């Protein structure tokens, strides 16, 4: 555990390191505010083990609030703008359309969380759409499924008020930096080759 609060991203990365140390095959993560229904856990777990038409398994499964079959979920106007903008950036940068680029409901296989556990591979502040840009450009297979969500009944979102606007600007620069790093500078290709040395 961390002896003091090091932030959202650092907390998640600590969980990935724990999963690597324990030899887990999958990690399923969800927000701690009660908005993600526990029924999503089994759905994501099954999807991680489901091959596509080409016989490939996903590396990352996203629980989407905006796919057909998802439960209705109210979103503020500011957040809607951010979602649309991040979708455009991901589509432009990777060719993939992701309906919910900031979802915290995700399932990861061992390749993904082992990669995330390494230094400088994971944003220790706000790992969201920027991580999807990175993983898609590195060739990780990302799949989305509809999710069951609940409206927050207590507490305050870390993206409340004007925070979504500030977050949108910060994430935009982070996504651009990731695109340059992976698409132009190709800085992480050696890390992927190293990752392939591991067997399940």
Model regions and ranges:
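DNA-recognition element of transcription regulators
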Residues: 129
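Terminal low-complexity segments of carbohydrate-biosynthetic enzymes
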Residues: 170-200
């Amino acid at each position: 555990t961390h002896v003091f609060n090091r932030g959202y991203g650092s907390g998640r990365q600590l969980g990935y390191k724990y999963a690597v140390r324990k030899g887990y095959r999958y990690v399923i993560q969800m927000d701690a505010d009660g908005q993600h229904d526990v029924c999503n856990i089994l759905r994501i777990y099954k999807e991680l083990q489901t091959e596509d038409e080409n016989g490939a398994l996903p590396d990352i499964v996203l629980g989407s609030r905006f796919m057909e079959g998802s439960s209705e979920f109210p979103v503020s106007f500011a957040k809607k703008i951010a979602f649309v903008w991040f979708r455009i950036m991901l589509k432009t940068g990777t060719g993939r359309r992701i309906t919910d680029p900031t979802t915290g409901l995700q399932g990861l296989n061992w390749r993904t969380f082992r990669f995330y556990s390494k230094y400088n591979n994971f944003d220790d502040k706000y790992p969201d759409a920027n991580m999807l840009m990175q993983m898609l450009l590195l060739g990780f297979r990302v799949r989305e499924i509809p999710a069951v969500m609940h409206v927050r009944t207590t507490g305050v979102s870390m993206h409340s008020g004007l925070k979504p606007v500030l977050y949108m600007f910060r994430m935009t620069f982070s996504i651009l930096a990731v695109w340059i790093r992976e698409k132009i500078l190709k800085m992480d290709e050696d890390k992927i080759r190293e990752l392939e040395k591991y067997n399940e």
